[in-house]
Each structure stands twice: as C-alpha cells, then as structure tokens.
Amino acid sequence: MCTRFVYRGSNIITGFNFDIDLSVWTHKVMKEKERFYIGILRPDGAYHSYHGVNQNGNVGTLLYVHGNSAGAYQGGGNCMTIADLTEQFIKAQISFDEVLQIVKSKKIVYAPDATMQAMLSDVHGRTLVIEPGIGYREEQSKYSLITNYSLIKPESTRDFIVPGDDRYERALQLLDNCKNEFSVSDAFTLLHTVRQEGAWATRVSFVSSVNERTVYYTENNHFEHIIKFTFPFA
C-alpha cells in the first residue's frame, strides 16, 4: 500500500511512501552516482529499481493494485511488463517521450507475480499514470496523486478499497491547499499524514527536488530523521 504524488510549482517536487509487508518483500535503500532507489530483491538475486529517482529527473514508482484479467502477464514482442517499463525509465534507458510511444504501441501487462500500476514523471514535471489492462493518462494539472486504486477506471477497484483507507482523500486535501511555494517540508508533512503502520507499514519515504538535484528520505516512519542525498554534477 503506497502513496505517490508530483507537485508542479516553482519547483518540481515528488513524494513517495513505500508501504510493504516485510514477510513478502526484501528491500534496501540504494544510493548510486546516477540513481537513488528502493532496491527490491527478486528471484534473480538482484535488487531491482522499481521505485526511484534518476539524476536526469526521471522518477518512477510502482504501486500495488487489485489486478484485472485484461492486464494479466503475457509474453511476446507486443507486450511489456509495467515492472520492466518502470525500471528502464528509472535507469534512464528510456525517456518520457519514449515511454509515451511504448504505451501507445505495446500492451502493458503485469509482471508474472505482482499486479502493479505506475506513476512516472520527468524533470519538467510531465506525469504519466499507467494502469495495465485499463490504459494510461498524461496529467497536466498542478499536481498528480495516486495510491492503490485505479484513477482511470475507478469503478474497477472500488469494491477492493480497504475499509478506512482514506489516504487519497487526505493527501488530496493537502495538495489542494498548497500554492506555488510547496516545499520539501510540505511534502514530508503530506507523507507523514498518510503514513501506514502495522504489517504493511511505511518502510521508506522519499521526496525529490528537481531544483536541488536532491532526494531526501527517511526509513520506518522516523520523520524526525531526514537523510539528504544530492546527485553529483557531471
């Protein structure tokens, strides 16, 4: 259960709460010269970057969603998994414009073992929501927000909303009340407001600032202890 947003003001600010069950997934924060990401251990033994930030401003995140049969995994050259698409974007192997061409020309499907939707954004704040089996939407408004339910076809996941899960509504209210001066501090206030506890607790929260070329993050809801990671200039 995760929360992701992009705010397009005088600075492009993105925020993400990574909420997982530690009995299901193994993760660790990875900091490299060109990437900051939450590494997810996969069966191939590698920590994959399905949630992260590239120094070029690309930010990609996957969020769990109740799956639909139209998005079920398929092989073949005309299909691409949402996991591969997101990781390639975070690695800057493909650009935002190339992602747009891919979602227009290929069928985007779930990975074989997980049903996820994605939000991808670039250094200019251009934002794309991708929902396998449903479609995609490029967003132009002041902000974008997604949790674990469909934005493009809300009725498809309405029956699967967890009772009491109002993260989207609470985050939406905070974003609605903000102006152009939306800051890193404001972003962490939002993430703190919608943090999760229990088995699916928030394990990592990060905020990226385009103007600063910096990612700020904290682990395990320790919002009093924010760590700063700045990408080096080439």
Model-identified regions with their sequence ranges:
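Phosphate-interacting basic helix/loop segments used at nucleotide- and nucleic-acid interfaces
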Residues: 101-113
